[in-house]
Each structure stands twice: as structure tokens, then as C-alpha cells.
UniProtKB/Swiss-Prot annotation:
Originating species: Homo sapiens (Human)
Protein name as catalogued: Calcitonin gene-related peptide 2
Stored InterPro entries: Calcitonin-like (IPR021117), Calcitonin/adrenomedullin (IPR021116), Calcitonin_CS (IPR018360), Calcitonin_gene-rel_peptide (IPR015476), Calcitonin_peptide-like (IPR001693)
GO BP, sorted A to Z: adenylate cyclase-activating G protein-coupled receptor signaling pathway; calcitonin gene-related peptide receptor signaling pathway; intracellular calcium ion homeostasis; regulation of cytosolic calcium ion concentration; signal transduction
Location (main, coarse): secreted
Keyword Secreted: yes
Length: 127
């Protein structure tokens, strides 16, 4: 009973092995025979081959750099959005005044603007 299940598998495997033995793969060296051996290249041919390889590499890197700059330009435009609301303008003006220094700072009265401004009160200015 087990031999009947095993018999088709055995026949199929024998057929596959017979077909694999009768087929011959193409020789691997035949494809390489057409290209010249690097050891037999003249110095001029080797120099031209090296120049072509370097030129292709430089062109490939230049195209990659150009593509990278294009993708960075589009993504940075999406990341930096102009904020023209009153809160953003006020914060930008407060930052400008705090960075300006010198004479403006001596006459500058602190306002209730900035990251630490909310809920902060100064008692010395309320007099």
C-alpha cells in the first residue's frame, strides 16, 4: 500500500534526473571569451577604460546629487511655512527686540510676550 504512493514519486524523480543528465548547460567561459582579458590590455586601452569608468562614476554622482537637492528643496518648502497670525508676528517682533541690544534695550520696557510670559507677573512694574 505504501509502495503505490511511493511509486509515482520514484518514477517522476527518475524522469527528472534523466532529463537533467541529458541537458547540457551552456559553458560559462564562452561568454567571457569574447571580452578581452584585462591582463592583455595595452596601457592606452587601460587608460581609456579607466577614464570612461571615472567619467561614468562622476556623472552618476552628479545626477544623484541633483536629484537629492530637488527632493530637499521640495521638502524644505513644505516644512517652512510662513506664519502671519498676530501671535507669530508678535513673537517675531519680541525676538527681534530682545536680540537687538544696545540703546534699544536700555529704553525697552518688558511686555507680556514670549515663552515665559503667560501667567507671569512682575510686581515691580505694576506700581
Amino acid at each position: 500500500m505504501g509502495f503505490r504512493k511511493f511509486s509515482p514519486f520514484l518514477a517522476l524523480s527518475i524522469l527528472v534526473l534523466y532529463q537533467a543528465g541529458s541537458l547540457q548547460a551552456a559553458p560559462f567561459r564562452s561568454a567571457l571569451e569574447s571580452s578581452p582579458d584585462p591582463a592583455t590590455l595595452s596601457k592606452e586601452d587601460a587608460r581609456l577604460l579607466l577614464a570612461a569608468l571615472v567619467q561614468d562614476y562622476v556623472q552618476m554622482k552628479a545626477s544623484e546629487l541633483k536629484q537629492e537637492q530637488e527632493t530637499q528643496g521640495s521638502s524644505s518648502a513644505a516644512q517652512k511655512r510662513a506664519c502671519n497670525t498676530a501671535t507669530c508676528v508678535t513673537h517675531r517682533l519680541a525676538g527681534l527686540l530682545s536680540r537687538s541690544g544696545g540703546m534699544v534695550k536700555s529704553n525697552f520696557v518688558p511686555t507680556n510676550v514670549g515663552s515665559k510670559a503667560f501667567g507671569r507677573r512682575r510686581r515691580d512694574l505694576q506700581a
